[in-house]
Amino acid sequence: MNRLKERYNTEVTENLVKKFNYSSVMEVPKIEKIVVNMGVGDAVQNSKVLDNAVEELELITGQKPLVTKAKKSVATFRLREGMPIGAKVTLRGERMYEFLDKLIAVSLPRVRDFQGVSKTAFDGRGNYTLGIKEQLIFPEIDYDKVSKVRGMDIVIVTTANTDEEARELLTNFGMPFRK
């Protein structure tokens, strides 16, 4: 069993039940899924760029990404409806906990001038969004093989009803929030 999942079952549920006075252990919020999205605007001119992004995302998450397509045509960007412009991965279960563990323990501390992640990036429904400026913070990415530095969005979807519950859940998992 994964380290974070084990921690959730032993410590985290206990701490949250004490703090929020839940009547049942089933009320305790948990992480439902993690969505990693990489928008590749350059893919409009050069489709090889998207292949590199898909490959990198697969290395980072350990799962084959879904290629996202444009919903609308935008003439200014020379974009047609249905053109591939990004990639996303939805992680659940074991892979989700492995990715979160790697993100918290290895990747985030590798960010330059890292002070902690923002406390205000919750959406009001208990979900947390995190933007990463470069894919090089992940240990799987080889610096020499990277053609272009790309960022990505990471959305952590929880079953928490409020932002406060979600913040407490992620803090118990060891998410380094800014002081």
Curated annotation (Swiss-Prot):
UniProt-listed Pfam families: Ribosomal_L5, Ribosomal_L5_C
Key words of the record: Ribonucleoprotein, Ribosomal protein, RNA-binding, rRNA-binding, tRNA-binding
Keyword RNA-binding assigned: yes
InterPro entries in alphabetical order: Ribosomal_uL5, Ribosomal_uL5_bac-type, Ribosomal_uL5_C, Ribosomal_uL5_CS, Ribosomal_uL5_dom_sf, Ribosomal_uL5_N
Domain of life from the UniProt record: Bacteria
CC annotations in GO: ribonucleoprotein complex; ribosome
Keyword Transferase found: no
GO biological process: translation
MF-aspect GO terms: rRNA binding; structural constituent of ribosome; tRNA binding
Cited function: This is one of the proteins that bind and probably mediate the attachment of the 5S RNA into the large ribosomal subunit, where it forms part of the central protuberance. In the 70S ribosome it contacts protein S13 of the 30S subunit (bridge B1b), connecting the 2 subunits; this bridge is implicated in subunit movement. Contacts the P site tRNA; the 5S rRNA and some of its associated proteins might help stabilize positioning of ribosome-bound tRNAs.
Self-association and partners: Part of the 50S ribosomal subunit; part of the 5S rRNA/L5/L18/L25 subcomplex. Contacts the 5S rRNA and the P site tRNA. Forms a bridge to the 30S subunit in the 70S ribosome.
Family (UniProt): Belongs to the universal ribosomal protein uL5 family.
The protein's name in its UniProt record: Large ribosomal subunit protein uL5
Annotated source species: Staphylococcus haemolyticus (strain JCSC1435)
